[in-house]
Amino acid sequence: MARRALPGIDCVEASIGHPSGPPEWKPNPSDTQVIFHQIIDWSDAYANAPNIPGGDRWPAAWVQPAQAYRDALQAGARAMLDISYGERARNRFDLFSPEGRPKGLVVFVHGGFWKALDKSFWSHLARGSVESGYAVAMPSYTLCPEARIAEITREIGAAIARAAAMVEGPLFLTGHSAGGHLVTRMISATSPLPDDVRARISHTVSISGLHDLRPLIKAAMNAELHIDEAEARVESPALLAPMQNARVTCWVGSAERPEFVRQNALLANIWTGLGAKTCVIEEPGRHHFDVIDGLADSDHQLTRTLLSP
């Protein structure tokens, strides 16, 4: 796993220890780091809002800044909304353009556990990349339970291919939570993307991504997701090989639920051994809902990392 010096942010490798000795074995805190992972309630493990002070403010807190950004870019003829990429009602994406010719294309895939929200909540997060000279596409997709996760994977592949046909240059993929799963799925060996589109992908940043779907089978939300063991095995990036020359940064807030921190390190740990260039970043003090805020700022390390060559 690559280590990169980022001002104020540590790019770290996971260090997970498990006691293997008799019951009386105790670690020496002076030279041993031991992290125990024991989860009894998988629904609580993924419950963000109840575990964030004021967490009930989201997602409503994103609506106004997203609308204001869309309005501003529409006024300058730099926003194309509801571009079709498929036949289903939610197969639409918005495209935001910089002033002048784009240097390339960023695609942001939203979260919501594959079952909630749409592209309209996140428009303001395009600002950092747009101000850096890149076009930004933000797709919606059919939600669970109307669609299975495997279908959503194919839809995101179609959205990226359509957007890539409209904007020349390198591609940068990023997504949050379920969106982190979907963008890393795009750079797995079984990606639905055409070869020519895959070849253009320069960097992928999974923000608080869910890379192993198997634990979600045990969560209450699976009543809507309908994940089974078979689907989890073919749709979990951590259980798949990365595509050739994959480069991925796994980014998470240090104040997130421990399960998101674990899932964040998980993909980088596994894909490093399979030949991918990987990095793990825990942004100090960030929780699940504000960890994405840096995308709105061209000078923030999250945007700079995403667009790094």
Predicted regions and their residues:
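Short, surface-exposed "cap/lid" segments of acyl-processing enzymes
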Residues: 99-128
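Primarily recognizes the serine-hydrolase "nucleophile elbow" in alpha/beta-hydrolase
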Residues: 158-220
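The feature captures the conserved acid-bearing segment of alpha/beta-hydrolase catalytic domains
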Residues: 203, 217, 229-265
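Catalytic nucleophile-loop/oxyanion-hole region of alpha/beta-hydrolase
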Residues: 117-126, 137-172
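N-terminal cap/lid segment of alpha/beta-hydrolase-fold proteins
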Residues: 48-100
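C-terminal catalytic histidine-bearing segment of alpha/beta-hydrolase fold enzymes
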Residues: 265, 272-309
